[in-house]
């Protein structure tokens, strides 16, 4: 059975993508003694499945590391979870910790399946069956606005952490999707859209998403909002 230590039945969910795997694994390692961590691959259906579980009140909290499905929705990739991604949390009073994992890319199948209109873009053959497309500064701006509006509507406590040094394994110096201008477009749009409050906070960190220190920051954010939330519900 699913279990937790000291908090009753707490089911914590995370989103993972290949290029954010080190982050998710590090977070899981730090929390697995206290929570049963359910990891969903952010492939469109993964995000949808997670949100169905949340809507059924089977999840008591979320660490949404990889919001990459939003990039597919905005940029026209094949792994979108649809325009309602994140909407379920507006109806649920559960802790939400999020980040912008892999929003630097949209996804397609094999290279020859990429629509012709994208053939002039920065493309990366992840493997023979997966081609990644770098999101542009304008797309990143739209992603920031999309996520910001959704975060503002969330009912429960929110901490959204931004790793300023890169959003995926291939978004760092010397790698194909390193584009500080595009990343900054996302950050600026999110900051302009997001409404900080006593319950909702945006946190910028001078780290890469796969740094151990960033994983620890996610865990700290989780503990900051999940533990008080659990105590208030059982008091």
Language-model regions, residue ranges each:
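Single conserved hydrophobic/aromatic residue that forms the stacking wall/gate
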Residues: 1-7, 11
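Gly/Ser/Thr-rich loops at beta-strand to alpha-helix junctions
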Residues: 15-23, 43-45, 67-70, 102-105, ...
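Short acidic, glycine/serine/threonine-rich loops at helix termini
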Residues: 23-29, 49-53, 73-77, 108-112, ...
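A conserved active-site cap/scaffold subdomain adjacent to cofactor or substrate pockets
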Residues: 37-40, 45-95
């Amino acid at each position: 059975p699913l279990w937790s230590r000291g908090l009753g039945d707490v089911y914590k969910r995370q989103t993972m993508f290949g290029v954010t795997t080190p982050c998710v694994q590090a977070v899981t390692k730090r929390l697995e003694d206290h929570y049963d961590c359910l990891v969903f691959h952010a492939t469109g259906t993964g995000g949808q499945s997670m949100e169905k579980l949340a809507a059924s009140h089977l999840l008591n909290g979320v660490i949404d590391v990889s919001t990459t499905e939003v990039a597919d929705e905005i940029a026209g990739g094949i792994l979108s979870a649809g325009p309602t991604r994140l909407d379920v949390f507006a109806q649920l009073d559960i802790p939400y910790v999020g980040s912008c994992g892999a929003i630097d890319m949209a996804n397609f199948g094999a290279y020859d399946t990429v629509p012709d209109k994208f053939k002039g873009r920065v493309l990366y053959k992840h493997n023979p069956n997966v081609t990644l497309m770098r999101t542009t500064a304008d797309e990143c701006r739209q992603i920031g606005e999309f996520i910001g509006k959704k975060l503002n509507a969330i009912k429960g406590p929110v901490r959204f952490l931004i790793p300023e040094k890169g959003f995926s394994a291939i978004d760092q110096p010397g790698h194909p999707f390193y584009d500080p201008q595009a990343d900054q477009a996302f950050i600026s749009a999110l900051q302009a859209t997001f409404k900080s409050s006593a319950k909702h906070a945006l946190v910028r960190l001078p780290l890469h998403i796969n740094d151990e220190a960033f994983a620890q920051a996610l865990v700290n954010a989780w503990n900051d909002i999940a533990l008080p939330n659990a105590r208030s519900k059982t008091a």
